[in-house]
Structure formats: structure tokens, C-alpha cells
């Protein structure tokens, strides 16, 4: 089929002939190849792809084939279904098998199915995040933004489809997974037979994802730090290119700062992070003013340059944006302020290194603060006294490499004498100890499943609200790498 560029006239003709559902499908199918493109409609999408040299008659035919507009293949592109199918068998595709799979699943669901799926994912996306009248593809996009669904991460979707008794669609997912694993196995075999083969690819991309820092958010957030959607990059890297991993070899791995204003979980938090290889710095029951001094002191420590990471555990009364010391000052201490003190600008010795935050706050019922978005607070950065020299020629974004796990629960949990330990911190410790050689993000997804399971068996007042936001650029494993 012709690889020649597509004229504006042809793009206009195609766009005029598509209905709204077909336009939605085409925009969805192209999400992997439209990184950094703001394409609000199909015409702009196709025009942008054409300008980038990614749209030819062959790729446009592929898109029309995927949305089943075989009539337009013949009328506008002067080709037919059989010719397109033959071309796809012999040539690389514009659209990933992953996108095709999700589109086909969406076509097989009726509105009741979609409504049930939206309901089942509320504990992951946040209640009210996705309107009930949204389509399946809208739901998928939201789950992708939260990093709950990806080409290699379909467990949540399988679980939800099983709950609505659509086992037939799970079969499609299983076939896709087996096919992907088979392709990866074949590629690894090929690479093993060619040990001197040098593979070059865009250094901004690792495992199909952009290395530019963007906050991946699990759970609802009313404000968004970065407007760009979190999604798979436009480049499809060979499956055998391994994702880059953070260096975690220093002894200790880094300082683990524990500020505990409650005291119920201190012992096993110390044991957990000590077992991971961190040097523990514990502060029990500090006042709010003391917290400020503690955080400033550790943000300016020169020792960070000798370590590969930093961890911080905060346990207190508070909400999703602040914590209180022993004196319970009403305004509390800003969690954004804590995060900003350890960014690459204010703590250069930690630039490019993972900075982990695990937060358990207890709040009065109904007093939850505005939202749990992790945002930059410029003025607060200026208050830090740290003055290390800025590294030269550093290209790492200052907000990169942050892992922010925040759990809130009702303060009534602390009134139970026999079970006042945090379910979140207990299960977090178990996950970190048992799965230390697995990626931290994967462990946290499983942690969210466990907290969800707990929530499903208790009253609303006993439930935990857990969210994860991160700007990790590489795979993070809390073990020597």
C-alpha cells in the first residue's frame, strides 16, 4: 500500500464521514502515538500525525480498518479490506495490539456493563471521579492516567470483568497476554543468539514510557500538577530492551527519617526500614515547630551525596495536605512543604535519586482537607537553608524521582485499645519485607488491593483512604541492584 503523505483534502473527507463514536475510537487508538500532541479532534489528530511524517495512506487505511469503516477504504482511499489486512500481516502497525484489544472489549460491552465497571473502579479512581454516563474508553483513559491499566498491566480490568461475569472478555485478555509474552520470549531468544548486537533508541524513552517527570496519580485528585496525560509513549520499544533501574547499592541505602506523632507503629516501622538497609533517624511526638526544624536539618544534610536514596515516614493527626505535631497546632505543617524541601533544586545531593514518602494521617470525620494532589509550592522552597553547590550539566528535572504514598483514616481508629495499629502501615511493612526484590510501584498496587479488601468488610468510619503519586523515571527495587 502507498506510504505517500495524506493531503488535507483527504483528511477533511475522512473526518466528515465519521460519527462521534468512531471519532472517539480513533482518538483512543492513537493515544500511544500522540505524545505531546494536543489533538482535541480527529482532524487535528490526523493533521498533526501528517506533519510529523506518521500519517500515510497505509496508516490512515489502518485506522479506518480498525474503526470498521470499510466503505471509506474503498470510496476515499481506493483500497479494500483484504488489501489492508494483507498489509498489516506484512508490516508494522501504527496502532498497538493493546489499543485494539481495549477497543474490541469496549464494543462488546453494553451500557449496564460499563456502568458496573465504573462503579467497581471507584475505590481506585476516587468516588465521583468518572461520571456514570462515560464510555468504556473514557474509563480506560482515566485508569491509564492513574497507572492502573497499561499494556502489561491488565489485572485490574480482568478482575472487574470477572465481577460482572464477562469471562468471555477475559479470554481475549489472556490471549493477548500470551501473545505478548510469546513475542517477548522470541525476541529474547534472538538477542541471545546475537550477543554483540547494539541497540540504539531514543534516550528519553524506557520501556515505552517517557523519562520526563510527570505525576502518576492513583486515586482521585481535584487538581493536577501536570496537565499532560500519563500514558504510554508514542514509541514502541522492542520488548527485550530492559527498563532502566535506579542504583541501590550504597550502605546504607540512605537515611530513613521517621517522624511519628502517634507512636503505635514505631517498632515495626524501624524494623522494616532497617531490614531494607536504611539508617533510621526517629523522632517521637515532636511539636509542630520541631517538625519544621527536623525537616530542614535533614534536607540540608551533606551525607545524602553518599547514599542512593532517601525515605521518610510521617505518622500524625492531620489530613491530605498537613500534619500536626504533639501540640496539635490547628493549621498544622504543610506536607507540600516537606516534599518541596527534598526536590532536586533544594536538595541537590538527592537529585536523580529516589525520594520515598509514606504518610499515615488520622483526621476527624468530615474534616478531610481539599485534595491529595502533590503540587509545587514555590514560596516554601525559598525557606530552606540548604546551600550545596548545584551540580553542573544536570538535566534531571528537580521534581523527578518522588514516590508519595498517602493514607488517611478517621481518628476514631486511635480510640481502639487493642487494634490501634494502622492497617496501611502494617500491610506496607509486610509488602516491603516480602517483596523487596520486586518493583516498588507493583508492591504498592498490591498494597492498594489489600487495603481495598479491608475496606470492603468494615464500616465507612473504619475505612482507609490510600493514594499514590510518583514521578519515578526508572524501576525502583529496594534491594542492591
Swiss-Prot record:
Chain residue ranges for the region called Interaction with CASP3: 197-436
Site residues, Cleavage: 371-372, 377-378
Gene Ontology biological process terms, A to Z: apoptotic process; necroptotic process; negative regulation of apoptotic process; negative regulation of extrinsic apoptotic signaling pathway; negative regulation of extrinsic apoptotic signaling pathway via death domain receptors; negative regulation of myoblast fusion; negative regulation of necroptotic process; proteolysis
PTM per Swiss-Prot/TrEMBL: Proteolytically processed by CASP8 generating subunits p43 and p12.
Pfam family, one: DED
Ranges where the record places region Caspase: 265-360
Tissue: Highly expressed in heart.
Keywords associated with the record: Apoptosis, Repeat
GO CC annotation: cytoplasm
GO molecular function: cysteine-type endopeptidase activity; peptidase activator activity
Upregulating conditions: Isoform 1 but not isoform 2 is activated by BCR cross-linking in primary B-cells.
UniProt region (Interaction with FADD), positions on chain: 6-229
Chain spans, region Interaction with CASP8: 6-200, 372-481
Effect of residue 371 to A: Loss of CASP8-mediated cleavage
InterPro entries referenced in this protein's UniProt entry, alphabetically: Caspase-like_dom_sf, DEATH-like_dom_sf, DED_dom, Pept_C14_caspase, Pept_C14_p20, Pept_C14A
PROSITE patterns per the UniProt record, alphabetical: CASPASE_P20 (PS50208), DED (PS50168)
Domain of life: Eukaryota
Protein's recorded name: CASP8 and FADD-like apoptosis regulator
The organism of origin for this protein: Mus musculus (Mouse)
Gene it is expressed from: Cflar
Amino acid at each position: 500500500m502507498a506510504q505517500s503523505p495524506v493531503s488535507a483534502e483527504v483528511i477533511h473527507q475522512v473526518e466528515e464521514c465519521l460519527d462521534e463514536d468512531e471519532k472517539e475510537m480513533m482518538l483512543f487508538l492513537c493515544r500511544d502515538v500522540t505524545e505531546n500532541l494536543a489533538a482535541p479532534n480527529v482532524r487535528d489528530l490526523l493533521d498533526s500525525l501528517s506533519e510529523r511524517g506518521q500519517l500515510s495512506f497505509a496508516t490512515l487505511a489502518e485506522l479506518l480498518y480498525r474503526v470498521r469503516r470499510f466503505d471509506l477504504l474503498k470510496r476515499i482511499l481506493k483500497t479494500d479490506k483484504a488489501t489492508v489486512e494483507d498489509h498489516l500481516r506484512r508490516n508494522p502497525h501504527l496502532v498497538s495490539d493493546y489499543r485494539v484489544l481495549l477497543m474490541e472489549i469496549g464494543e462488546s460491552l453494553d451500557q449496564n456493563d460499563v456502568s458496573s465497571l465504573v462503579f467497581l473502579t471507584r475505590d481506585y479512581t476516587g468516588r465521583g471521579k468518572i461520571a456514570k454516563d462515560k464510555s468504556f474508553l473514557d474509563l480506560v483513559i482515566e485508569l491509564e492516567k492513574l497507572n492502573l491499566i497499561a499494556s502489561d498491566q491488565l489485572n485490574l480490568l480482568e478482575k472487574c470483568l470477572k465481577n460482572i461475569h464477562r469471562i468471555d472478555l477475559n479470554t481475549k485478555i489472556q490471549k493477548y497476554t500470551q501473545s505478548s509474552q510469546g513475542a517477548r520470549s522470541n525476541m529474547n531468544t534472538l538477542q541471545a543468539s546475537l550477543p554483540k548486537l547494539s541497540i540504539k533508541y531514543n534516550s528519553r524513552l524506557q520501556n515505552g514510557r517517557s523519562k520526563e517527570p510527570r505525576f502518576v496519580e492513583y486515586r482521585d485528585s481535584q487538581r493536577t500538577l501536570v496537565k499532560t496525560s500519563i500514558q504510554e509513549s508514542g514509541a514502541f520499544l522492542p520488548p527485550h530492551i530492559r527498563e532502566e533501574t535506579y542504583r541501590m547499592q550504597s550502605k546504607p541505602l540512605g537515611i530513613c527519617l521517621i517522624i511519628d506523632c502517634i507512636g503505635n507503629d514505631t517498632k515495626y516501622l524501624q524494623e522494616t526500614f532497617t531490614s531494607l538497609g536504611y539508617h533510621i533517624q526517629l523522632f517521637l511526638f515532636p511539636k509542630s515547630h520541631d517538625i519544621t526544624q527536623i525537616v530542614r536539618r535533614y534536607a540540608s544534610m551533606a551525607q545524602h551525596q553518599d547514599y542512593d536514596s532517601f525515605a521518610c515516614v510521617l505518622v500524625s493527626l492531620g489530613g491530605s495536605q498537613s500534619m500536626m505535631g504533639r501540640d496539635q497546632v490547628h493549621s498544622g505543617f504543610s506536607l507540600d512543604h516537606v516534599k518541596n524541601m527534598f526536590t532536586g533544586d533544594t536538595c541537590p545531593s538527592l537529585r536523580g535519586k529516589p525520594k520515598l514518602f509514606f504518610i499515615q494521617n488520622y483526621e476527624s470525620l468530615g474534616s478531610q482537607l481539599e485534595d491529595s494532589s502533590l503540587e509545587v509550592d514555590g514560596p516554601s522552597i525559598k525557606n530552606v537553608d540548604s546551600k550545596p553547590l548545584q551540580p553542573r550539566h544536570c538535566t534531571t528535572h528537580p521534581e523527578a524521582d518522588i514516590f508519595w504514598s498517602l493514607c488517611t483514616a478517621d481518628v476514631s481508629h486511635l480510640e481502639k485499645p487493642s487494634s490501634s495499629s494502622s492497617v496501611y502501615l502494617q500491610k506496607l511493612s509486610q509488602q516491603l519485607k516480602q517483596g523487596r526484590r520486586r518493583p516498588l510501584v507493583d508492591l504498592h498496587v498490591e498494597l492498594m488491593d489489600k487495603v481495598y479488601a479491608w475496606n470492603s468488610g468494615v464500616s465507612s468510619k473504619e475505612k482507609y483512604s490510600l493514594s499514590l503519586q510518583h514521578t519515578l523515571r526508572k524501576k525502583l527495587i529496594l534491594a542492591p541492584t
